[in-house]
Swiss-Prot record:
GO molecular function, one term: RNA binding
Gene3D superfamilies recorded: Pseudouridine synthase I, catalytic domain, C-terminal subdomain, Pseudouridine synthase I, catalytic domain, N-terminal subdomain
The encoding gene: truA
PANTHER family assigned: PSEUDOURIDYLATE SYNTHASE, TRNA PSEUDOURIDINE SYNTHASE-LIKE 1
Keyword entries, A-Z: Isomerase, tRNA processing
Function as written in the Swiss-Prot or TrEMBL entry: Formation of pseudouridine at positions 38, 39 and 40 in the anticodon stem and loop of transfer RNAs.
Record's protein name: tRNA pseudouridine synthase A
Amino acid sequence: MLRYKAIVEYDGTNFVGWQRQQNGLSIQQLLEDKISTFTKQTVNLIAAGRTDAGVHALGQVVHFDLIAPNNSKDLACINKETDNKEVSKQNNTTTTIDSLKKMLPCRYNAYKLMSAVNYLLKPHRIILTSCEITTLQFHARFSAKARHYKYRIINRTVPSVIEQNRTWWIKPPLNVIDMIDASQHLIGKHDFTSFRSSACQAKSPLKTLTKIEVDTTNYPEIQIYFSAPSFLHHMVRNIVGTLVYIGLCKISPAAIKTILFAKNRAMAGPTAPSSGLYFVKVDY
């Protein structure tokens, strides 16, 4: 068995989300179908995060397994080692992990697999930006130490034609200072019940938010960055919706603590549109 780790970039606009569904085309379904077409094997993709319909990704991480060719006698070395270390030396020829990977048949070579799948994905707005053989111990979801998201807002009197379906347009001017002040009360380990969706299946509402940063460097675009080991369903979008209400003076900045401690979704702001959300990267 060979395990592959890939990084995926996609525009989520025309998809029903990451996960396979019966009511439309998902990113998982399309990727699995194209990988299977090239490798002639059925594959099951495991993702670091299951993004909703309309959510984009710059660095979604996935893993999948392929049944290796029977003559891969050095397969155990590939599966156990991630570094390009020396594994054997015969007749003055040194064999390394990287050289073993390059000797794999075409459909098992990570770079050739990536190139072929990217070709098959056209014209869909999905692309593999990297692909490598990793250890069998790697798990895209459970090995993750931190996940990073960003949310993009356009704050001006007219919407952006170019950024349609990629941002949330807010016409009235936002009080960004109040948004920044309020956001800092959410950093740390808290019960985020007030910011989780009713459909959230997480066993516990306790999450540790390590970063919220409101960036106005490119105003009228506002980018809000989030980092945490994991998130609740709709947690980022519900926080953004609440911060926007604070920026519009519909909620006072001081009320953010009351909302957090109330553990009541009805007290927080609306769920921000999926179009402005990006899954940026995963730390392992």
